[in-house]
Amino acid sequence: MKKGIAKIFCVIGISIFLHTVYSALQHRKYLRLTDQPFEGVPFDIVVECIISLFLFAWGIINSQFLIPIKASTHLAKKSFDSYDYRPNFTVFNHRGKYLNEILNK
């Protein structure tokens, strides 16, 4: 499938999904105005949402710009020392000092 057609499927899928959201909001507003209980979204809105999901997924899958997910391509650029270096996971305010005080009493 050509790239342009895949983009068209994506745009159509997103626009149908936005219309689905708008329809659901309008339905909810209508139920509030008429004091009816909310029992769920109507069937046509659910079908419209599923159709938009399939159109958008089809467009994304056929866009031909998917990047392969391989660890070797990302890890080839790093040195061996940087694999396990994660400073964001270093915690200095932990319960170790309190446990040390309790255990040494």
Swiss-Prot record:
It comes from the Eukaryota. One of its GO terms (cellular component) is endoplasmic reticulum membrane. Residues 1-3, 64-105 are cytoplasmic. One of its GO terms (molecular function) is magnesium ion transmembrane transporter activity. It is a multi-pass membrane protein. It is found in: Endoplasmic reticulum membrane. GO terms for biological process: magnesium ion transport; protein insertion into ER membrane by stop-transfer membrane-anchor sequence. The chain crosses the membrane at residues 4-22, 44-63. InterPro entries: MMgT. Residues 23-43 are lumenal. Disulfide bonds: none annotated. Keywords: Endoplasmic reticulum, Magnesium, Membrane, Transmembrane, Transmembrane helix, Transport. Belongs to the membrane magnesium transporter (TC 1.A.67) family. Component of the ER membrane protein complex (EMC). Part of the endoplasmic reticulum membrane protein complex (EMC) that enables the energy-independent insertion into endoplasmic reticulum membranes of newly synthesized membrane proteins. Preferentially accommodates proteins with transmembrane domains that are weakly hydrophobic or contain destabilizing features such as charged and aromatic residues. Involved in the cotranslational insertion of multi-pass membrane proteins in which stop-transfer membrane-anchor sequences become ER membrane spanning helices. This is ER membrane protein complex subunit 5 homolog. The lineage of its organism: Eukaryota, Amoebozoa, Evosea, Eumycetozoa, Dictyostelia. The gene is mmgt.
